[in-house]
Amino acid sequence: MSSQQWLGDGTARRWRELHGESDWDGLLDPFDLDLRRTVIRYGEMAQATYDAFNHEKLSPHAGLSRFAARRFFERAQLPGHSAAYRVARFVYATSCVAVPEPLILRSASRARRCRESNWIGYVAVATDEGKAALGRRDIVVAWRGTVQSLEWIKDMDFVMVPPKGLLRDKASDAMVHRGWLSMYTSRDSESSHNKDSARDQVLSEVAKLVSMYQDEELSITVTGHSLGAALATLNAFDIVENGYNRAPRAAAAAAGCPVTAFVFASPRVGGHGFKRRFDGARGLGLRLLRVRNARDVVPRYPPAPPYHGVGTELAIDTGESPYLRRPGNELVWHNLECYLHGVAGARGGEAGRFKLAVERDVALANKSYGALRDEHAVPAGWWIPSNRGMVRGADGRWTLMDREEDEDSAE
């Protein structure tokens, strides 16, 4: 599949509009077709972090990516992305404060590679082919969330702290969730993966790519789901607040390239002071589109007040889909593939009814759970590694081999 076929006709010409230059005014209702495709495209880049994540606790590679950076999108079965983007770096996170177990997966193997760190996402950049199709050189940061039980969001404490290091001045009253900030900024000098924080890993790679392509038209796009959406919100703000969207040779007063976050099922990130500071960064090129499923509980946490949402909301309701079981359950309502199914069909028919306006295989909704009606004859949770990573050797013995050897080549 070529990049142009995958994107649709309007993306290159309208990319600034689709990335929120006018805050998506007039594009959400009725739901613009090119915007649907754009939201789905970045959602698939977030979904790839789930599809690649090794959550087999018995594996020494639990918590890492099963896919190598060089073949990442190909292995994630995203041929359009494979032509349009290359992964420049994998990103790892840890936390210096206690967080619920689903947020940091710990291997039970004595030979485990990661003890207190997990692979949390990647930085990618448009290829030359992708640049031609997209209309600019796009830098993407994709953050992984959690696919475990949703009890973690209810079990967390909701303490807010100042976002130290993220703000240029110390007088701000901005406050953010302690757990999200810790995942974003924590480092561990004893770790093989987190001597630098997730924040430092991402910002150094973004700075490198902005410098490398500073003579071209650039955009920075950040995406994530659930926990990944919270990290994406902090990251997008951080990039703009601290000028990482500006080329090194740019004049002091020069505008940086646009930074847009497309986030899904996002918990709230901070209080009113953070919202005010986030809104104030619009003038520096920051935009955020927050996709929320009507029945999903995660966007309702942490409670408001004192927490406040940021950005522009895109509301969907997967309960209106004729393809999905009714009423469903919390896991299905929160599932990213079901979100993308909802984006493909929300308000796509007459009188705002659900109808797939984008041809997207409904089988994807059953990738992790049994969301589809039985009449579609798609097994529940069908996305699993072949033989769960077990490989038969020449000696007839079966061995767990669930990691491509050049995984760390993008670090």
UniProtKB/Swiss-Prot annotation:
Supply the PROSITE patterns for this chain. Answer: LIPASE_SER
Principal subcellular localization? cytoplasm
* MF (Gene Ontology): phospholipase A1 activity
Q: Which domain of life does this protein belong to? A: Eukaryota
Question: CDD domains, per this entry?
Answer: Lipase_3
GO CC, sorted alphabetically, is:
cytoplasm
Q: Which GO terms describe its biological process?
A: lipid catabolic process
The residues responsible for catalysis, as annotated, are S226, D296, H334
Enumerate the InterPro entries for this protein.
AB_hydrolase_fold (IPR029058), Fungal_lipase-type (IPR002921), PLA (IPR033556)
Family indicated by similarity: Belongs to the AB hydrolase superfamily. Lipase family.
- What is the name of this protein? Phospholipase A1-II 6
Q: What is the lineage of its organism?
A: Eukaryota, Viridiplantae, Streptophyta, Embryophyta, Tracheophyta
